[in-house]
A protein has these predicted regions:
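Glycine-aromatic micro-motifs
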Residues: 2-117
Length: 117
């Protein structure tokens, strides 16, 4: 009998979609599928840590924030990852002052997503 590793779904609209960020945090590239987070819009915030800015090649973070416009949605990618990869993502995102919440995506599935703390 083979045991499979339990997995969770993680929706990313920002830096966790980048190959170099995935390699640095998970040790491999993730495979995902496109989806969207309805009822949210993207805002940006400056990156304070120069090491993080260098890693991702950007000066600002994307932040998904609830929107009053029902037409708004944030596009991104949903990844199936392990619990240990989720813990690594938590560590990476907490450094950027994000918190993880459970949401329903446009496809109808539930996934974790990081939003501004």
């Amino acid at each position: 009998m083979t045991m499979s590793t339990p997995t969770v779904l993680l929706f990313s609209y920002g830096t966790l979609q980048k190959k170099n960020v995935q390699l640095a945090n998970f040790g491999h590239e993730l495979t995902g599928r496109e989806d969207a987070l309805p009822g949210y819009a993207l805002r940006t915030a400056p990156i304070a840590d120069p090491k993080v800015a260098e890693l991702i090649g950007e000066l600002h973070y994307a932040n998904a924030e609830p929107s009053s416009n029902p037409e708004d949605a944030v596009s991104g990618t949903v990844f199936e990852i392990t619990e240990s990869e989720l813990a690594a993502a938590d560590e990476y995102e907490e450094a950027a002052q994000y918190r993880r919440i459970s949401v329903r995506l446009r496809s109808g599935i539930r996934a974790w997503v990081y939003v501004r703390a």
